[in-house]
């Protein structure tokens, strides 16, 4: 698929307020988003950004290779209820230290320091891989309860690169 098939409406939408919760299936963040600003467009349909969560050990693999983590950005079509989930691999990059004031660090500090529950703000653009037009797509279902079907999966080809400190915070 090319860039024209997927548009990231939230790429320049700015900060989102949300609530982080540590549950049985890991860390999830529910988001208070606006349908006209925080969406992706796929197949000419808008899917509102609804939540995000992390999986330790990626659920997807590429040529048999798993990644240490996978981030899921869950989007919902407000009319049909169908989902579009953007899967982003997370990999540790030992050669690229990040500065402490990066937006990703601020977000990770909020979820790591908030215990099991925390209010957060984030700019979802921090998760955009270097080539967002390069992804694998398939139709499937959720891998966690309630196991909804009618899910369009978009698994980004390029991983989000983080340093070891950021990886530790994501796993907290």
Predicted regions and their residues:
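Alpha-carbonic anhydrase
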Residues: 1-172
